[in-house]
A protein has these predicted regions:
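C-terminal beta-signal and adjacent terminal beta-strands/loops
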Residues: 29-32, 124-127, 173-185, 207-259
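Flexible glycine-rich, low-complexity coil/linker segments exposed to the extracellular/periplasmic environment
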Residues: 38-89, 128-131, 150, 162, ...
């Protein structure tokens, strides 16, 4: 289920005329999830690392997913689409918008206006079963190839601050992703695990509305040229390009024109 609320103060204070807060809570369970099981999980489960095959039977579901020579050497692993039992997740999404004219601080009307926007997400839980009737394992705050979505930070946020003076706007944006634990350390610690630290990226952009038809814009993404965190458990790469900026600092310019 989901529940949400929006609050805008009904007061005539200059600083609160353009202030609003929204909160959304979700708690969702999906059954018979279709996906693939990671190779480390297949091998560990076949050899009973998590209690999945106490008899070490070759007929075990996980053992049937890879082939071996008579010597025991593994020659291939099948990662087919299977029903992965259930996924349960819960969390909170929030957004805060606030804006005011700098004249409210006693500055001249020509000083312009400030506007702030904060979008923040808190992931309370992301529990997954490896197979039907298996125990749920909570992957909230982890990152790794065996997860649906790859990166599951407990906290992530985007904060933007915009200063507008007449036709000119300047925006500074801060993107934050909280530190995460290598999913290979869940539920038991892995000595080869590589965790990721807090990740922060800043973007700077501006625009100039020349008239009702033409607007110029320019900016710099990843202002500090922040490298993505390195970890080894993501498939075919050493980071998660869907979560982290892999291109580094880059400049853009553009023009919007209406005819």
């Amino acid at each position: 289920f989901t529940a949400g609320a929006v609050w805008s103060p009904a007061v005539d204070a200059p600083f609160l005329r353009r202030f609003s807060v929204s909160l959304d809570y979700y708690k969702i369970e999906v059954t018979d999830v279709v996906g693939t099981i990671g190779v480390p999980t297949i091998l560990a489960s076949c050899f009973n690392a998590d209690g999945s095959n106490p008899g070490l039977s070759n007929a075990n579901f996980y053992c049937q997913q890879f082939s071996r020579l008579a010597s025991g050497q593994i020659t291939g692993v099948a990662q087919t689409q299977v029903n992965l039992a259930s996924v349960k997740t819960s969390g909170i999404d929030a957004q805060v918008d606030w804006g005011f004219d700098l004249a409210d601080l006693g500055l001249p009307e020509t000083a312009g206006a400030l506007a702030f926007n904060l979008v923040i997400s808190r992931l309370d839980s992301f529990e997954r079963q490896a197979r039907p009737n298996a125990a749920f394992v909570d992957y909230a705050g982890t990152i790794g190839a065996d997860l649906s979505g790859g990166a599951l930070p407990e906290w992530k946020s985007v904060l933007s601050a915009t200063w507008a003076v007449g036709p000119v706007k300047t925006t500074l944006r801060w993107r934050h992703i909280a530190a995460m634990t290598d999913a290979r350390s869940v539920p038991t610690f892995s000595p080869t695990a590589v965790n990721t630290p807090d990740y922060d990226v800043y973007d700077l952009s501006g625009s100039w509305k020349i008239d009702d038809r033409v607007t110029l814009r320019a900016g710099v993404n990843n202002l500090a040229d922040q490298d993505p965190p390195y970890f080894t458990s993501y498939p075919n790469s050493n980071t998660d390009p869907s979560s982290f900026d892999i291109l580094g600092r880059r400049v853009f310019v553009g023009i919007n024109a209406k005819f």
